[in-house]
Amino acid sequence: NGIWRGGTSINIDSPLGIGDRVYFSYMTVHKKKADRSWKRTTESLKPGEILPIGPKGYDPVKDTLPYKRELDLYNFRYTMKFRDYTLSLGSSRSENISSFYTPTTIYDMETMSSNFSVNLDKILWRNQKSKLSLGVGLKRKHNKSYIEDTLLSDRILTIGDISLNGTTVFYGGIFGITLDYERGLRALGASNTPKAEFKKYSLNLNYYKPLTKKLVYRFNTLTSHSKDVLYASEKQSIGGVGSVPGYHRRGNIMGDRAIEIENELSYKIIDSEKIGRLSPYISYSYGAVRNNKNPSVYGKGYVSGASIGLRYSMKYLDVDLAYAKALSHSSYIKPRDREIYFSTSLKIRF
């Protein structure tokens, strides 16, 4: 069974005539509605009554209650450039409802996340081949989760961020590096727990190298390190589309310390302005995580996977189809035998 996602996005160049840009996107999934009219709250029970486990006539041995799934993702970003500075404002919101089973019944969980960010980047130095920039930013994250109508968590994080970014020409390719430091702050209503005042370091390296006119190699690695026990939202997550292939539905891992390495070879079969660009590709990725103060078997893990796919792009259309296979992984991870990834986008310009 697959999960189909659909959405739309809008890019507006220079809406104020000052070289700025506005971006908005919305994404959702095929929703699975389920009748929950049989459910009751504990407050509505009379003395001696117990909560029902299903609708009238339900048998937990023979019957299966329907799963509920809803997901809505909203994202907004505004950027403005002035000389060597770039100001970025961002806002996003996600609303997710899913279900989990127990031996006798089913429960629905709802999570809501609202994020706001502001970033300022300055180009420190550049020439025809290289560029170095410094960025500072502030993020506010508000996460709520419920099981049925019971509040499970309500957390606000405020995060300060400073990063150093560089790109240069290296052995006929383009090499990029980003060093990043994040710190949880007591500001803007943030939680005052020790976990909310974390420190985290990240390093991203990427390399793009045309080996011939048609053969291209891409390399990307992302590693993060923290001595603190992080909230799940701040851990580095590995597995699935855009990460280690083969673990999108099952087998995602996350950790306070993590590394992910991605390699890809692509070959341009067609490269035409009229017809478009067609490129088959093959990729291999590896990822590993470790969680602080967690000595159990689930405290660390690793995954590796490969994919083979085909990309097609033209002026108004992008298509990507890939077959993904999980390779080696930690013993407790149970991925699917294979996964198929498909995405397409229609571009309309005014």
List each model region and its residues:
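Outer-membrane beta-barrel "beta-signal"
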Residues: L310-L317, D337-F350
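C-terminal outer-membrane beta-barrel translocator/porin domains of Gram-negative envelope proteins
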Residues: K144-R277, I282-Y286, R290-N292, Y332-K334, ...
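Repeated loop/turn-to-beta-strand initiation elements of outer-membrane beta-barrel proteins
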Residues: L16-V22, R83-L89, R126-L132, F170-F175, ...
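Hydrophobic, lipid-facing positions within transmembrane beta-strands of outer-membrane proteins
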Residues: W4-I10, D72-F76, S114-V118, T158-L164, ...
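Extracellular loop and loop/strand-boundary signature of outer-membrane beta-barrel proteins
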Residues: V29-K32, R36-R40, I50, D59-T64, ...
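Transmembrane beta-barrel strands of outer-membrane/channel proteins
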Residues: T8, V22-T28, L89-E95, L134-H142, ...
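Outer-membrane beta-barrel initiation region
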Residues: N1-G90, R126
